[in-house]
Amino acid sequence: MSIVDQLHDQTLKMAAEITANPQSDTLVEDFDAFLIERDELMRDIQHELTDQEKEKIKEIIQTDQQMAKQLTVIQNGIKADIQAIQKKKTKQLNYQNPYQPMTSDGVYYDKRK
């Protein structure tokens, strides 16, 4: 199996995993390992590519773009979850101690004696 074939198979496998389990806890770790393996395989490509290998590389690029879109959606979902948790946390703190976050806006100092 050529390096391009291995790269193609790994890319399709990772794309299928992202599509099948977008909320997986191990997705980030798996994707990181995939990127490391892909980088090593890409460094090993040193020969002239055949037409068939060029077509596979075009398919890899298209799949990579689709994975990037899916990962952006997942990232935005995670950001929204983090923001919701932070809002919930601040509301809970304000409820527990409503006089803590006193601001100094509108403070009037009387200079009369």
UniProtKB/Swiss-Prot annotation:
* Disulfide-bonded cysteines: none
This entry carries the following GO cellular component terms, namely:
cytosol
Establish whether keyword Isomerase is in the entry. no
Q: Does the keyword Cytoplasm apply?
A: yes
Q: Which UniProt keywords apply?
A: Bacterial flagellum biogenesis, Chaperone, Cytoplasm
Leader sequence residues: none
Which GO terms of type biological process are on file? Answer: bacterial-type flagellum organization
Where is this chain's protein located in or outside the cell?
Cytoplasm, Cytosol
Q: What does this protein do?
A: May act as an export chaperone for the filament capping protein FliD.
- Describe the subunit structure: Homodimer.
Family recorded in the similarity comment: Belongs to the bacillales FliT family.
Q: What is this protein called?
A: Flagellar protein FliT
Q: Which gene encodes it?
A: fliT
